[in-house]
């Protein structure tokens, strides 16, 4: 769906849109040769783009997938058809649609495995694509490792995670003030400084102005108190609301994402996020939410709705 790419162009998450996969690959390689960081959105099926990359003999440095493989009926689009054709098939014959999705996801993950074998650092983003591919006959799907055990868990073990705040005033200047505060308090953290400086230049706000940082629990507490002081002194024009991401330490029980490959075997133990929520409420938090959803339930519910 091209409008999704266009939105990311408007909000500065992408630099360019090229819908022909071969032309997009040529453009990306040209930018790489020039040493220019550049992001290109390609409006096509992921399998089509991966096949073009493989057939050209190109080995990506990094490879992952964020298609909606957690919902093979409503979210995932089989290859060889337009979005409109996919919608028509989904409504006319959902079982046939799921068969086409299963065929495509097997091809999809096989292409990823091929590129991994050639040297691309390949990881799963927790969207259930490995499970769907394995059920579609790709026995080695889990040779692709999850990004949490590979990269993120050491941060979680330190209590570090994504921490966000929103300017209820709607005034970007309030976020600019909190950015300066964060740089004053944590400016010795080189990656944090780089992120804040680049975010100010590159990332457009969507809705209320907001910012996100990866901070440790103690750092979050200190920063929250310091922002309270800004509000009390009138250095920002309205209160700031703080929240955290579902991707965080102690936030989600998800055996193929946040809690994949837990060292103590607790991948699918689901009660500790609830206990954490209760602790937050008892500690005086004013905004606590508990979300529920399983990958299989979502697909089954979507199918039931269509079959009514």
Segments from the language model and where they lie:
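Glycine-rich beta-alpha junction loops
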Residues: 44-47, 66-71, 126-132, 244-249, ...
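Short alpha-helical segments and helix-capping/turn motifs at coil-helix boundaries
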Residues: 46-52, 107-111, 224-229, 272-276
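Short, surface-exposed amphipathic charged segments that create phosphate/polyanion-binding patches used
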Residues: 55-57, 77-81, 137, 256-259, ...
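Structural motif
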Residues: 37-41, 60-64, 120-123, 237-241, ...
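Glycine-rich, aromatic-lined ligand/substrate-binding cores of catalytic
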Residues: 108-263, 301
